[in-house]
Amino acid sequence: GSLVKLVSTLLSLVPSLMKG
């Protein structure tokens, strides 16, 4: 459902956040 899409979005943003 929408939860999968939400998780996918978060996983896509994580690398950007970790790079600062």
From Swiss-Prot:
GO terms for cellular component: extracellular region. It comes from the Eukaryota. The modification Methionine sulfoxide is found at M18. Expressed by the venom gland. Keywords: Amidation, Antimicrobial, Oxidation, Secreted. Disulfide bonds: none annotated. Its main location: secreted. The modification Lysine amide is found at K19. It is found in: Secreted. The keyword Secreted applies. The keyword Secreted applies. The peptide spanning residues 2 to 19 occurs in 3 forms and has been given 3 different names. U1-PONTX-Dq3a has an amidated Lys-19, U1-PONTX-Dq3c has an amidated Lys-19 and an oxidized Met-18, and U1-PONTX-Dq3b has no modifications at either Met-18 or Lys-19. Transmembrane segments: none annotated. Coiled coil: none annotated. This is Poneritoxin.
